[in-house]
């Protein structure tokens, strides 16, 4: 089963400490080597590059960041191929433990979502 983990936090924290980047890189290396992590990526703050395209009352609007009204913004993601939801939660907990250890005072969350299996298009 494929799962996506989505890390969210307040935008005002700035960039993570280098020690956290290093620890996340090591965790990612291990998960990639054992075949459980398929993809991962971090996102720049919305004040650097952030745009929202929205439909509201049938109208499309485009808004440039930063998004002052947002309580949390997505900071990154990972896609895993795992056997169960429990394994996905374990991966998220390990990731959050690194934040707790290397970025004291940071507050945020990691959301775990199972991905849909989409059938291939028919010819």
Where is each model-derived feature located?
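Conserved, structured core segments of small domains
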Residues: 1-123
